[in-house]
Swiss-Prot record:
GO terms for biological process: defense response to fungus; killing of cells of another organism. Keywords: Antimicrobial, Disulfide bond, Fungicide, Plant defense, Secreted, Signal. Its main location: secreted. Belongs to the DEFL family. It comes from the Eukaryota. Disulfide bonds join C38-C64, C50-C75, C54-C77. This is Defensin-like protein 206. Residues 1-29 form the signal peptide. It is found in: Secreted. The keyword Disulfide bond applies. Coiled coil: none annotated. One of its GO terms (cellular component) is extracellular region.
Amino acid sequence: MAKNLNSVSFTVLLLVLLVASTEILKSDAACFTFLGECGPEPFTGSNADCLACCVALYKSPPVCAGRVEGVPAHCHCYKS
C-alpha cells in the first residue's frame, strides 16, 4: 500500500512540475496592471473597440486587454 501511495505522489509531483514549467494553465488573470485610459468620455463602444483603441495608442506588446468600465463608461487599457 505504501509503495502504491509513493508512486502516486511521485506521479502527481511530476504532473505539477510539467504544468508549471510549460505554463499550460496560463490565464487572462495575469492581465491586470492598469496601463491608462483611451478614447472619449463616456466611451460608447464595446470591449473590442476599446481593445483596438488601446492597441492603437499603446501598441500591441504591452497591451493585453481593453475593457469598458465605470459610470460614465471609460475605456481602460491593461498590460500583463
